[in-house]
């Protein structure tokens, strides 16, 4: 633990000189920017200093410098194709690839032969859902998922519906957690797959994965979980939890973008129809040359996560508690979305009544935040996840997601809280609805008319 603290302090010290001129607090992780051409896409040092601090780690995490160190040799010196079997260049890359496979497997309690490398969680989800459904389509045409899944899961299910499959979209309770009795009732004789995410990407709610796995196992059907937001953050064991397929994303656990993995159980064997044709790499499940530097980075990220999970979780929990308590203490009419107990602390979703979320995001220009999933945040529609848990439209529009991660500092949390409190108060002062509430008017009693 002392080594970890020392490493992080050294990381902060190395960047403090460049940041002294900035009013924004020192970030937990900042890369040194070298000189570059005038028209380069790389930001200048001045631009880098003025960048907002990062509080959106649920969208993506910064690359851990130790992961980059592991990747660099395979970007520069060991560039062989891992599928070339006739010379040392291929053997070196293949050995690195298999070591990475072992590192990923170890993190989730799997056999390395059950790990298939992909381009990320979206591809893994597509392989799991479409692959299982299509393989068993001759006798099983029904799937079960939830209304709060990631968009790529929901869109995969809708795609299968267009092919003639039936899909049950389970509602969730106000807490964001599914009712296990409703799950059991939804299972039909021809159900092939149940897909429920481990940790929700917008509200951080943890589903009862072990209980779901037990239900699926007893009913002899396959269980898939999108664990992109959970792997490396909370303990997961695919055997204890009876998980048959699991999706993993590299850039959600301080690894590189463009790489992920899917766990597919071997015993009893889960049969999956491959989505693409080619050279038959990855046991025929995912044809195409495996990018050695990226999978090495994924493996290193998984190994670090396994070593530091407990430390990170305790530290993130304290920072999350600090953020929530300070905001709740200083601002009335703030609602935390999702179950506060069955919840991953690094994902905090708060609704600020009588404030438009987009206006608050624009005001908080010194802090990188989001109003929900990065995959759907461009939409002006309220979050479908918040609608699914019964949040009214006004509160859904006023939600902000705060992401706390490995490199988030106490100073950053305090700065974010300070700015948030200031701008919420300022925006509320401009709100006629807030003024009416302060005058004791019950907004629900008002009958609004359209002009």
From Swiss-Prot:
Active-site residues (renumbered): 375 (cysteine persulfide intermediate)
Example GO BP: [2Fe-2S] cluster assembly
Gene Ontology cellular-component terms listed: centrosome; cytoplasm; cytosol; mitochondrial [2Fe-2S] assembly complex; mitochondrial matrix; mitochondrion; nucleus
Gene Ontology MF, one: iron-sulfur cluster binding
UniProt KW keywords: Cytoplasm, Cytoskeleton, Iron, Iron-sulfur, Metal-binding, Mitochondrion, Molybdenum cofactor biosynthesis, Nucleus, Pyridoxal phosphate, Transferase, Transit peptide, Zinc
Residues given in the record as Zn(2+) binding sites: 375
Binding site for pyridoxal 5'-phosphate: 121-122, 229, 249, 251, 289
Listed cofactors: pyridoxal 5'-phosphate
HAMAP family for the chain: Cys_desulf_IscS (MF_00331)
Assigned protein family: Belongs to the class-V pyridoxal-phosphate-dependent aminotransferase family. NifS/IscS subfamily.
Protein name: Cysteine desulfurase
Species in which this protein is naturally found: Rattus norvegicus
């Amino acid at each position: 633990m002392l080594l970890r603290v020392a490493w992080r302090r050294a990381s902060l010290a190395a960047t403090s000189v460049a940041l002294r001129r900035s009013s924004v607090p020192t970030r937990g992780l900042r890369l040194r920017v070298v000189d570059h051409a005038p028209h380069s896409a790389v930001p200048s040092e001045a631009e880098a200093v003025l960048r907002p601090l990062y509080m959106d780690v649920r969208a993506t995490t910064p690359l851990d410098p130790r992961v980059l160190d592991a990747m660099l040799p395979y970007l520069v010196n060991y560039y062989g194709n891992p599928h070339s079997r006739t010379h040392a260049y291929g053997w070196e890359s293949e050995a690195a690839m298999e070591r990475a496979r072992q590192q990923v497997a170890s993190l989730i309690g799997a056999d390395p032969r059950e790990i298939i490398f992909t381009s990320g969680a979206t591809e893994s989800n597509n392989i799991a859902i479409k692959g299982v459904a299509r393989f068993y389509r001759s006798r099983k045409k029904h799937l079960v998922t939830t209304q709060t899944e990631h968009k790529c899961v929901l869109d995969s299910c809708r795609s299968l519906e267009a092919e003639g499959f039936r899909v049950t979209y389970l509602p969730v309770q106000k807490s964001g957690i599914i009712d296990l009795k409703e799950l059991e009732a939804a299972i039909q004789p021809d159900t092939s797959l149940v897909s429920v995410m481990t940790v929700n990407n917008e509200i951080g709610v943890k589903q009862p994965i072990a209980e779901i796995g037990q239900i699926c196992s007893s009913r002899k059907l396959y269980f898939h979980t999108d664990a992109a937001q959970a792997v490396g953050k909370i303990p997961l064991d695919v055997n204890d939890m009876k998980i048959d397929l699991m999706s993993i994303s590299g850039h959600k656990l301080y690894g590189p973008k463009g790489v992920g993995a899917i766990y597919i159980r071997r015993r009893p064997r889960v049969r999956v129809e491959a989505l693409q044709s080619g050279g038959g790499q990855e046991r025929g499940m995912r044809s195409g040359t495996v990018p050695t530097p990226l999978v090495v980075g994924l493996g290193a990220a998984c190994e670090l996560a396994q070593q530091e999970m407990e430390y990170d979780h305790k530290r993130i929990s304290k920072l999350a508690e600090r953020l929530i308590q300070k905001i709740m203490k200083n601002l009335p009419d703030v609602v935390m979305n999702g179950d506060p107990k069955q919840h991953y602390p690094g994902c905090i979703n708060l609704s600020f009544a009588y404030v438009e979320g987009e206006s608050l995001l624009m005001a908080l220009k010194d802090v990188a935040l989001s109003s929900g999933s990065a995959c759907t945040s461009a939409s002006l529609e309220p979050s479908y996840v918040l609608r699914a848990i019964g949040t009214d439209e006004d509160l859904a529009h006023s939600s902000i997601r705060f992401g706390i991660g490995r490199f988030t500092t106490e100073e950053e949390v305090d700065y974010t809280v300070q700015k948030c409190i200031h701008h919420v108060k300022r925006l509320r002062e401009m709100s006629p609805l807030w003024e009416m509430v302060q005058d004791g008017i019950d907004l629900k009693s008002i009958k609004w008319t359209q002009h």
